[in-house]
Amino acid sequence: MQTSPDLTSARSVIRLLLFAKSRAVVAELEEHLRQHIQGLPGQYPAQLEVVPLEEHPYLAEHYKLVATPALVKAEPLPAQVLAGADLATQLEVWWPRWQGQAALAAHQEGAGRDPASPPTTEALLQMSEEVFLLRQERAQLREQLDFKDRVLAMLVHDLRSPLTATALAVETLQQGREGSLDKALERQLFDHARQQLRKMDSMITDILESARGAASELRIRAVETQLPGLCQAVIEELWPRIQGKRLQFQADIPVDLPSVHVDPDKIRQVLFNLLDNAIKYTPAGGSIRLDVLHRTSQKVQVTVSDTGPGIPEADQESIFSDSVRLSRDQQQEGYGIGLSLCRRIVRAHYGQIWVESSLGKGSSFHFTLPVYRLCKR
């Protein structure tokens, strides 16, 4: 834990703080200023201390610093900031006035008077640090609350469609209980209702996982898993939607893939989310690919590609943040948290996830998983 600069000496000492990004950056300037101060006339000494901004960011806010290096006369009050190329020259210009302020402070202390009873610099800086930390905490809480509000609003909107579709299917089945529906239509309605219920379940699962927060750890129960079967199950679940948009779908999943060491339920979520996004953003008649490759002896790589609108290069990293929702998403169902959840799951398996995309040419999402035999004990 970093300690605040020592600012507890008498007010008659001229206390100088040299702000810089780090100590190493201003080592030469610090030595130059110390030698320069020793050559200045005056009764009252100066104490110079280097303050690295990376250790005390709240001090930069307290003194309203806009550039570094900067020299701050912290005591006697009032504080004064010097900035620019030639701090030694500025110090020499202000030195007589600072000597006068130190003399006045010493006289008032000697007379038993507290000059205007101002808070000590130590107290001011401690309060500044507390205010800085409180502002940070408030900003983080506000961001979390805003995100939860957006999620709730989108959840209400997105659940309405599958709920309505399920209700219509159930009502139709209920009306046809007396035999007015043929078996093929009944089976189609049951399948449609089941598909919509799974869709709602997936939405709610994503919401619950996201609500745990980025800092929480996922509970991973890794076991030996065959990826071909897992991929096939997800494809079958999404197949009605693929057919409904007349999408061309291709899969290249070698039968001799090694087993992977994963939590099958969590990896199913990743596959479902990536394929669901590909279906969502690929226009009718477009194409989607699912490729699984034994990349190295240690990893298997999974790739989901589409011919959708693509993702701007500037957004290709931020899309994995739980608070980002691209402009292309505004007319689509979703929460802007699916990819964030995918990243958390993949990283929890010690894998990587990334995207390659060009505007107007589609996107390819890749992620890696550990091969099972390397995890045996």
Curated annotation (Swiss-Prot):
Protein name from the UniProt record: Adaptive-response sensory kinase SasA
InterPro entries in UniProt: HATPase_C_sf, His_kinase_dom, HisK_dim/P_dom, HisK_dim/P_sf, KaiB_domain, Kinase_SasA, Sig_transdc_His_kin-like_C, Thioredoxin-like_sf
Modified residues (Phosphohistidine): H157
EC primary class: transferase
Organism of this sequence: Synechococcus sp. (strain JA-2-3B'a(2-13))
Alphabetized SUPFAM superfamilies for the sequence: ATPase domain of HSP90 chaperone/DNA topoisomerase II/histidine kinase (SSF55874), Homodimeric domain of signal transducing histidine kinase (SSF47384), Thioredoxin-like (SSF52833)
Family annotation (NCBIfam families): PRK09303.1 (NF006800)
PANTHER family named among the record's database cross-references: HYBRID SIGNAL TRANSDUCTION HISTIDINE KINASE C (PTHR43547:SF2), TWO-COMPONENT HISTIDINE KINASE (PTHR43547)
Function: Member of the two-component regulatory system SasA/RpaA involved in genome-wide circadian gene expression. One of several clock output pathways. Participates in the Kai clock protein complex, the main circadian regulator in cyanobacteria, via its interaction with KaiC. KaiC enhances the autophosphorylation activity of SasA, which then transfers its phosphate group to RpaA to activate it. In addition to its output function, recruits fold-shifted KaiB (KaiB(fs)) to KaiC to cooperatively form the KaiB(6):KaiC(6) complex (independent of SasA kinase activity).
Gene name linked to the record: sasA
Record domain Histidine kinase: where: 154-373
Subunit structure: Homooligomerizes. Interacts with KaiC. Participates in the KaiABC clock complex, whose core is composed of a KaiC homohexamer, 6 KaiB and up to 6 KaiA dimers. SasA and KaiB(fs) compete to bind to KaiC.
